[in-house]
């Protein structure tokens, strides 16, 4: 069906976004052993001293409970219902409600050997602790740290590694060489433009490493511009989605929950997608108005690519890229 009016466009885009299978690129949760459930979820909500909870995390928590058909008005009963699930079944229900295609759950490099997941949609995101590159008496032994990364990736089957604390020397002498040797994709948080500059220098110096970079709103425009000319770089954008659509088309990641609980992940996705689809509508509207043959099928394909298709395509091609 060719779309020619704004209301049809809005309805089509909203439906495509709500039905899309999504890739979660950062879940801060021990999927193998971490505590989850209604009790943990409600404990995470900031108390409002009897007033209406208006915090974003409260909205996400209640959105998750609603999606899981848990009674929001009766927390003890919701906890009782949840207790009837096995851990595996409860996690599977969360992923099903989210329409999760893949979830990258953090696995500390120190726990890699024991990381086992009960659902094959969960993938390990090998995570380097902030003190991993803390210098000892003789400085930092980068070769030893690189070998630890390679061994941990092999132990848990990780193809992705996250460095939370930017360190240009660590990237140059350890992380990027380890990614090259073990065919890992690098996830990196960048908090300043100087860090982004340093990271881009290291990425350009490597001819094979693929990366997913993200940062706060002030860094996002720089990362978007960088990704426009670098096929090995994907950026995750939370605030500057209209700019990313303009500069990158659909080749970026528009969301990550960075949640501490699976239920938070579900709820944050439900609330985030309601902010994403209007931005997509605004991007499509000029095409619809000028007579471009925009169809609902094309929009569904676009949305699926945006919410994980490009990321998984890069994931599938990573090993081939390292062999080029």
Task: Put a short name on every predicted segment.
Residues 2-182, 204-208, 224-324:
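Metal-cofactor-binding active-site regions of metalloenzymes
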